[in-house]
Swiss-Prot record:
The modification N-acetylalanine is found at A2. This is Cytochrome c oxidase assembly protein COX20, mitochondrial. The lineage of its organism: Eukaryota, Metazoa, Chordata, Craniata, Vertebrata. InterPro entries: Cox20. The gene is Cox20. Essential for the assembly of the mitochondrial respiratory chain complex IV (CIV), also known as cytochrome c oxidase. Acts as a chaperone in the early steps of cytochrome c oxidase subunit II (MT-CO2/COX2) maturation, stabilizing the newly synthesized protein and presenting it to metallochaperones SCO1/2 which in turn facilitates the incorporation of the mature MT-CO2/COX2 into the assembling CIV holoenzyme.
Amino acid sequence: MAAAPEPHETEKKPFKLLGILDVENTPCARESILYGSLGSIVTGLGHFLVTSRIRRSCDVGVGGFILVTLGCWFHCRYNFAKQRIQERIAREGIKNKILYESTHLDPERKMKTNNSS
């Protein structure tokens, strides 16, 4: 039998937006949703203050939410992917440095011997 969890150890369920997007574990999701919500309020309220049309202001607010959320999402994911590529390149460089250090394949060693000649 599996041991029952103790009362003070509650199992934490992830928060899923619309049952699809796991906001806690997906990179950039939380920030995108928060900025989209703020963009929705600003655009909807701003449009209402200018035109005093309620229905159109709600539509503008929804559009603002979609545009700001997608804009933040793509910007953040692009930066996240760029950072992962840079980390991978650095990791491979460090691995090669460790692997080839003090061997006849070491590029720094070849440069030093060519300069001293």
